[in-house]
């Protein structure tokens, strides 16, 4: 399996594996918004670019600005709905080569407050099994 190939990509294939991990909330301007089913971080979302792009630097200025506008739009909604103290942004693509941002709300007294968010063991094992 070559995760940099769109035919092996979780987001491009939009298959059962993806829908077991996340709920698609809405299409955005140039991306798709997902809510993780695993909610250690209440409100944790993911914004995935609409096309199979490996890195933010592969986008034109216009595409990058539109993608980041989608990310900001989501975080503003998260602030209104969940009222977290902070939102962690994660852009990891060494295991899944499709441009996406993890958005993890952080709450004082909640998991990993004051540090970076981490997937819990259930979430990590679930992703390993499915990808």
What is the predicted role of each segment?
Residues 1-128:
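HIT superfamily nucleotide-processing domains
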């Amino acid at each position: 399996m070559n995760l940099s190939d769109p035919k092996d990509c979780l987001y491009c294939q939009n298959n059962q594996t993806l829908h077991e991990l996340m709920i698609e909330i809405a299409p955005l301007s140039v991306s798709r918004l997902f809510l993780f089913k695993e909610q250690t971080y209440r409100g944790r979302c993911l914004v995935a670019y609409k096309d199979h792009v490996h890195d933010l630097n592969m986008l034109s200025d216009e595409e990058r600005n539109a993608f980041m506008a989608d990310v900001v739009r989501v975080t503003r909604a998260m602030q209104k709905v969940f009222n977290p103290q902070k939102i962690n942004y994660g852009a990891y693509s060494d295991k899944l080569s499709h441009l996406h941002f993890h958005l993890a709300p952080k709450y004082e007294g909640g998991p990993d407050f004051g540090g970076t968010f981490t997937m819990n063991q259930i979430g990590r094992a679930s992703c390993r099994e499915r990808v």
